[in-house]
């Protein structure tokens, strides 16, 4: 039997669709994107548990961030929240909310949830204590550790989400293609 015109003998890539509990239904009636679709910056989601790239009290590994966090923890938290939320929560909004909660003594209730999301995203252990305890007792150290962890995974929290996406796209454009040959 012959092949229709235009068809080649090359194997076609197979696409496997799996149902995922992370698919979200948006309130506007459409289906939201699954959480496992890339959103600009590739991140390795691993099921095995990794270790934090630095210890909780290693704040002087990034002394500039340690000083900023000591003086204005709301700035560091805002930067972390914007990256973890993939730009959905701007740094200023998260920082102001954190600052307001800080003066009530309840900022740990808001901030520990972002630590949990970082742990989940990078497969990190709930150590040295549960997230809420770490943020309640060691808040500035926890924020510094989370900031360093994001940097370890290639994010620059100072740039914000959009800046990190733009930087990743520029690096991708600068990377030469591999495995291509000239056909003659």
UniProtKB/Swiss-Prot annotation:
Keywords: Membrane, Transmembrane, Transmembrane helix
GO cellular component, one term: membrane
Compositional bias segments (type: Polar residues): 1-26
Superkingdom of the organism of origin: Eukaryota
Glycoprotein is among the record's keywords: no
Transmembrane helix among keywords: yes
Membrane disposition: Single-pass membrane protein
Span list, region Disordered: 1-33
Residue ranges crossing the lipid bilayer per the database entry: 94-114
Subcellular location: Membrane
Biological role stated in the UniProt entry: May be involved in heavy metals transport.
Family in the record: Belongs to the cornifelin family.
NCBIfam families tied to this protein: A_thal_Cys_rich
Protein name (database record): Protein PLANT CADMIUM RESISTANCE 5
Organism this protein belongs to: Arabidopsis thaliana (Mouse-ear cress)
Lineage of source species: Eukaryota, Viridiplantae, Streptophyta, Embryophyta, Tracheophyta
């Amino acid at each position: 039997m012959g092949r229709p015109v235009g068809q080649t003998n090359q194997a076609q890539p197979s696409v496997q669709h799996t149902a995922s509990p992370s698919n979200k239904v948006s309130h506007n009636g459409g289906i939201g994107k699954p959480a496992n679709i890339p959103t600009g910056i590739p991140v390795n989601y691993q099921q095995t548990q990794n270790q934090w790239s630095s210890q909780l009290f290693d704040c002087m590994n990034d002394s500039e961030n340690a000083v900023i966090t000591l003086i204005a923890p709301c700035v560091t938290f805002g930067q972390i929240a914007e990256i973890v939320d993939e730009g959905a929560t701007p740094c200023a909004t998260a920082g102001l909310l954190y600052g307001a909660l800080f003066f009530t003594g309840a900022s740990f209730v808001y901030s520990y949830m972002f630590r949990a999301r970082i742990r989940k995203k990078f497969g990190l252990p709930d150590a040295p204590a549960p997230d809420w305890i770490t943020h309640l007792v060691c808040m500035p150290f926890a924020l510094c550790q989370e900031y360093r962890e994001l940097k370890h995974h290639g994010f620059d929290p100072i740039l914000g989400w959009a800046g990190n996406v733009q930087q990743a796209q520029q690096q991708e454009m600068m990377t030469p293609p591999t495995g291509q040959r000239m056909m003659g």
